[in-house]
């Protein structure tokens, strides 16, 4: 099953910095990440089907942060399609939090569920993108974090059950799923992970193109 984007459809992207990528907060812009590539390619292919593209992603957001602004930033816009990529900031949060707080997978899944429930009730079509982590060598800067082999190992152990939670929610709400973590692992097997993400978290231009291509495969 694919999503048919008819004339007048409103598509909303939301999440964290991977989706945000320098989106002006005071303008109706899609930013410089994969949403811009999706919108550009779609508009090029289908000039006869105008679609409204919205992006309310915010760098640094976790699921709990999305919850605080969900009504005003997402629900009040009454989008027909909502695409969500969140979880990278929930992953390994204890390595950044001064109190060392670990975000349990149950808390992550319950919060994510609360985001999806009102959208599903309204008949909104949903696209969930797995959070992902590529195995970059050495110590790299990922946002405000310095990530080395030990941190990366902790992050991966924390991320895997959260990916499974996204799978469970996609099944519960009959959402379309983009298995981004699996996709990047397969792509990195031939090129090395740095080709797709310099820090293991934020995609390169090629990484954003890969996400956009996977997204567009879900639409007609």
For each feature predicted by the language model, list its residue ranges.
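Short glycine-rich His-centered loop
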Residues: 3-29
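Short beta-strands and strand-loop turn motifs
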Residues: 15, 21, 56, 129-130
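Acidic/histidine-rich helix-loop elements
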Residues: 22-32, 57-61, 94-103, 200
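Alpha-helical cap/lid subdomain in secreted, periplasmic
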Residues: 4-7, 37-52, 65-220
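Glycine-rich beta-strand-to-loop/alpha-helix junction loops that act as flexible
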Residues: 14-16, 59, 86-88
């Amino acid at each position: 099953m694919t999503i048919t984007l008819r004339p007048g459809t409103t598509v909303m992207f939301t999440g964290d910095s991977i989706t945000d990528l320098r989106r002006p907060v005071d303008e109706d812009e899609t930013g410089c990440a994969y949403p811009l590539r999706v919108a550009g390619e779609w508009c090029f292919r289908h000039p006869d089907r105008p679609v409204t593209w919205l992006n309310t992603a915010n760098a640094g957001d976790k699921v709990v942060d999305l919850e605080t602004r969900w009504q005003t930033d997402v629900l009040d816009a009454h989008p027909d399609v909502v695409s969500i990529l969140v979880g990278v900031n929930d992953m390994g949060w204890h390595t950044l939090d001064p109190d060392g707080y670990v975000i349990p997978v149950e808390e992550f899944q319950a919060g994510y569920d609360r985001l999806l429930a009102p959208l599903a009730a309204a008949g909104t079509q949903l696209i969930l993108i797995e959070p992902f982590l590529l195995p970059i060598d050495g110590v790299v800067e990922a946002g405000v974090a310095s990530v080395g082999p030990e941190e990366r190992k902790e992050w991966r152990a924390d991320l895997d059950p959260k990916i499974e939670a996204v799978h469970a929610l996609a099944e519960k709400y009959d959402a379309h799923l983009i298995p981004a973590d699996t996709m990047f692992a397969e792509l990195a097997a031939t090129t090395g992970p740095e080709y797709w993400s310099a820090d293991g978290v934020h995609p390169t231009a090629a990484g954003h193109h890969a996400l956009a291509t996977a997204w567009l495969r879900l639409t007609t």
